[in-house]
Amino acid sequence: MTSAESLLFTSLGPSPSSGDGDCRFNEEFKFILLPMSYAVVFVLGLALNAPTLWLFLFRLRPWDATATYMFHLALSDTLYVLSLPTLVYYYAARNHWPFGTGLCKFVRFLFYWNLYCSVLFLTCISVHRYLGICHPLRAIRWGRPRFASLLCLGVWLVVAGCLVPNLFFVTTNANGTTILCHDTTLPEEFDHYVYFSSAVMVLLFGLPFLITLVCYGLMARRLYRPLPGAGQSSSRLRSLRTIAVVLTVFAVCFVPFHITRTIYYQARLLQADCHVLNIVNVVYKVTRPLASANSCLDPVLYLFTGDKYRNQLQQLCRGSKPKPRTAASSLALVTLHEESISRWADTHQDSTFSAYEGDRL
């Protein structure tokens, strides 16, 4: 057994082999795949999210509810990508972590903090869209920017609170001259970590994903009704774009990662056949960069669904100055919402899409 193989086996946890208890992994692919993947996510994520934060802070105020959710989504993505250089070094150095236990805990914590904050912020956007399309009067009440800000603060705190045990599970472990930064925990604590991780997954991924699917199913049923008017067609197109982008992020980033991670954890707990466990391990490691890629895909949501964001981004790329805000444009959101209430009261049905017209980035 080579030293590299011994190191990889030590990091596994409970011995998965049903024979002599020695199941060695050949993870050479990981030392190429993960550094390259995380480096790409770092460059693209920072290049896409840093200008987004600047636009939200200096060119897109005042925010409506959707802009509030998207700002916090971009902030979460930016914080995460800033931690990726340490992981690039760690995997390029073949599982050697020289940065101390505290930073190991923080980087692993930040991965899941970003992951589940992103899930919940996308769920907030989905519910907000659903209310604007299917229940416009409730959208006026619950879609206020102040309520959205409080909800975002709650998301940050709830996710952080749920992940506090992760700070105790994750640790470093010396193996000769190499120091491991566990992405789970020590072998003797692995079964407890799986129970904790499964509970967090159900609460912060399973339930929000179910809510998102229900909202978009109800939205799709309403959106495919025939509607007159160009403005309503524009609103419908924007909503369909939102559905497409959010479901793509879930399908590409979140769902594969959680499925393969669950299979991998259970295979280790049940001490599956070594050959099976090797295959599961490879598939799981491949989906980890996909989970990080949501930091690059989220900006597509702002670009496809936000007219104001798209216009300001074009001005920023051209180096032109923003146009001065007029009183009429400052009051546009209020006027359009008031108009939507009037239309809804008159028709009780088809103008529900207009209630969302003012909610443009």
Curated annotation (Swiss-Prot):
Annotated organism of origin: Rattus norvegicus (Rat)
Processing after translation: Phosphorylation of Ser-329 and Ser-330 is a key step in agonist-dependent desensitization and loss of surface P2RY4. This phosphorylation does not involve PKC, nor other calcium-activated kinases.
Biological role stated in the UniProt entry: Receptor for ATP and UTP coupled to G-proteins that activate a phosphatidylinositol-calcium second messenger system. Not activated by ADP or UDP.
Gene name of the encoded protein: P2ry4
Tissue expression from the record: Widely expressed at low levels. In brain, higher expression in the pineal gland and ventricular system.
Protein name: P2Y purinoceptor 4
Ranges per topology, Cytoplasmic: 59-68, 128-149, 219-242, 306-361
Segments passing through the bilayer: 31-58, 69-91, 109-127, 150-170, 193-218, 243-265, 284-305
Region (Disordered), start-end ranges: 1-20
Disulphide connectivity of cysteines: C104-C181
Family: Belongs to the G-protein coupled receptor 1 family.
